[in-house]
Amino acid sequence: MIYDHNAPGYQKVYQQMGAGRWNGAYYYSKELVENIIPKVKTDRDWVTIYVLGMFCDHSVYFIHNNNSQAMYAPIKLYDDVVLVCGVPSTVPKVERYARAVYLPLSVDVEYVRQFKRRKTRGVAYVGRAGKRRNLSFAPDVDFLEGMPRDELLEEMSRYRQVYAVGRCAIEAKVLGCEVLPFDPRYPDPSLWQVMDNSEAVPILQGILDEVDG
């Protein structure tokens, strides 16, 4: 069974998010369900996105929030859960709840590449507005926020430099943008290596094979 972005519990919240619905967790969940999970052999259930109360035994659970790990505390009440983290530093923060592993973030490279455009603009911040709270940027920085993904990718592609983290940073690199750091937790943009969804499949398969012996 797969609990994902289509689950009624998530959709109820999703419809109330406004511009916040265009978030990385939603699109990563879509790619997990479409491009990765069907190619991984396991008898475990899957949880690809966070919804309060949506946990289950013997499952693979994808962690999206690297800031507020306490939200995942209820997982410790469930048996045999594997927590998949997209950032190495998150692993030790959540392993008190269940077995935690690191799977590098990946994107659908070919899908992103179709939005590549000529570079005609300078610098932009790309991501949710909340991630830049209490941070200051130069006056010439544009802000690409609250946009549907395809529109965002096309706009981002026109910039030479982009402030971004996570999958957004990987997408920027696919589009030929130079990624600049802005989050003090991730001072080195080289953390965000370009990896296609297909490359993540054997890594995740190997992790689960090792876990399940």
Language model segments and positions:
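Short active-site oxyanion
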Residues: 78-83, 121-123, 158-161
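A charged, aromatic-enriched C-terminal amphipathic alpha-helix characteristic of glycosyltransferases
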Residues: 189-213
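Short hydrophobic beta-strand segments
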Residues: 1-4, 13-16, 118-130, 162
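Short hydrophobic/aromatic-enriched beta-strand-loop microsegments
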Residues: 61-62, 100-105, 142, 179-183
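Donor nucleotide-activated moiety binding/catalytic core segment of transferases
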Residues: 140-198
